[in-house]
Amino acid sequence: MAELTISSDEIRSAIANYTSSYSPEASREEVGVVTAAADGIAQVSGMPSVMANELLEFPGGVIGVAQNLDTDSVGVVILGNFETLKEGDEVKRTGEVLSIPVGEKFLGRVINPLGQAIDGLGDIESEEERALELQAPSVLMRQPVEEPMQTGIKAIDAMTPIGRGQRQLIIGDRKTGKTSVCIDTILNQRDNWATGDPKQQVRCIYVAVGQKGSTIASIRKTLEDHGALEYTTIVAAPASDSAGFKWLAPFTGAALGQHWMYQGKHVLVIYDDLTKQAEAYRAISLLLRRPPGREAYPGDVFYLHSRLLERAAKLNDELGGGSLTALPIIETKANDVSAFIPTNVISITDGQVFLESDLFNQGVRPAINVGVSVSRVGGAAQTKGMKKVSGSLRLDLAAYRDLEAFAAFASDLDPASKAQLERGKRLVELLKQKETEPQSVEDQMVSIYLAGEGEFDDVPVEDVRRFESELLENLHATHGGVFEQIKGGTPFSDESKAELAGAVQDFKQGFQTTDGTPVINEPEARPLGDDEVTKSQITVSRKTQ
């Protein structure tokens, strides 16, 4: 058995190392106590130095955001499961404001408002963070909106164009296609993403507030099936989440988008929808005992939306020239755009696309009311070619709507009014589009130009969409040079116009309508003119008996 030996030198050396590395430290920690907790709100006492919007840590890893800073207590919005909290629980300050991780790895993922992955594909690694409450870019940091943000929807790109850095409101009753318009806009960025050019690529963020979980899953599948998920991030705060999550979700989307914008990249953020965010904020404010105002909303609900939407901008070239385009969605009741939240957001944004339930029920989809919809800054971003071909489209449609209302009561119309009415019917039919089928700007220009030239006037109304689809397919196959000439929205040249006119006439010769009749009929026989007849005298001899 080996003998145990103790070396005094080793013991002395170990003690010396331990004492030399020891440095006395005194730390101070401010803690509070929960005095009440219910409905996602906690009242905490004993934290006199807490900051507004500071993160507080509760037992079990639950966090909250300090909102009401009263003299003797703090009103805290709980983020997460508040049912485990009870009176007497200890609360610690973190000294940090609410922030989320950001970066390229968030593309293709579904996250909650805290930036945590909820799609079952593992955690998202990120070395950067960005605060949720950030100052919007100042006036000197911006430049005018001049680049188009193509939606792929003819009615929007032609009449209410959207530019990169713009805030365009999508407003309408429930079930009028508001989300579909925004999803189609995301799908239309696929070709830009495929180029690999950072100046053309658009990163998309879809913020779902207060929707059913099944609806969010369906949207994710639609994006995945069409190859759009790889450049899209979904921020989900479904109806089952607490009011705190619904309130913060749009700010999470904005923070993620601003990170890319300040890197000189282009971003599209869709807030679906801000009505539910306002309702969640109203619930939080009432539970915090803040004084209610109109429709029981707190006095700062306008500031809630303005500070969010002001983050959309087109930065100047010194800051990289990045942009953040915002498409907020607002749900109305009975098409009432004069309610509190709709009027607030209309006054904040740069224009609105108004979707009407009556048009939707008539089969006009997207159900855009041209008379109420407007884009205040997008006109400068519209391509020159589209601006030329669609110049009179809005007026033609508005005149058609007026004439249609008049024709319902008038017994007889003059030929000019009848022709205008017939062309209006075909324009309405031409502007209809199926979901998840956005059109390129070149296809839109060709369709609208030909409609303006009257090439659809002799096509039956029920065949207009099929005629357009088959015509574009034929033109791509046989006259691809026209599309190359107008690529990117360049105006039509005289040669392209002449080529199109001939190509359409050739196509009409073989097009069969639904009832089997050709669009161009054989001309009716006409009597010969005097100059076309050769006159000669015929001598008739008669036999005499």
Curated annotation (Swiss-Prot):
EC class name? translocase
Which reaction equation describes what this protein catalyses? Answer: ATP + H2O + 4 H(+)(in) = ADP + phosphate + 5 H(+)(out)
Where is this protein primarily located?
membrane
Q: Where is the composition biased (Polar residues)?
A: 535-545
Entry keywords, A to Z: ATP synthesis, ATP-binding, Cell membrane, CF(1), Hydrogen ion transport, Ion transport, Membrane, Nucleotide-binding, Translocase, Transport
* E.C. number: 7.1.2.2
Binding locations of ATP: 172-179
Report membrane topology: Peripheral membrane protein
Q: Which GO terms describe its molecular function?
A: ADP binding; ATP binding; proton-transporting ATP synthase activity, rotational mechanism
Question: Which pairs of positions does the record mark as disulfide bonds?
Answer: none
Which segments carry the region annotation Disordered?
A: 511-545
Q: Where in the cell is the protein located?
A: Cell membrane
Annotated site residue numbers, Required for activity = 373
InterPro entries (UniProt xref):
ATP_synth_asu-like_sf, ATP_synth_asu_C, ATP_synth_asu_C_sf, ATP_synth_F1_a_nt-bd_dom, ATP_synth_F1_asu, ATPase_a/bsu_AS, ATPase_F1/V1/A1_a/bsu_N, ATPase_F1/V1/A1_a/bsu_N_sf
Signal sequence residues: none
Superkingdom of this protein's organism: Bacteria
The family assignment reads: Belongs to the ATPase alpha/beta chains family.
The function of this protein is:
Produces ATP from ADP in the presence of a proton gradient across the membrane. The alpha chain is a regulatory subunit.
Any idea what this protein is called?
Answer: ATP synthase subunit alpha
Originating organism: Corynebacterium jeikeium (strain K411)
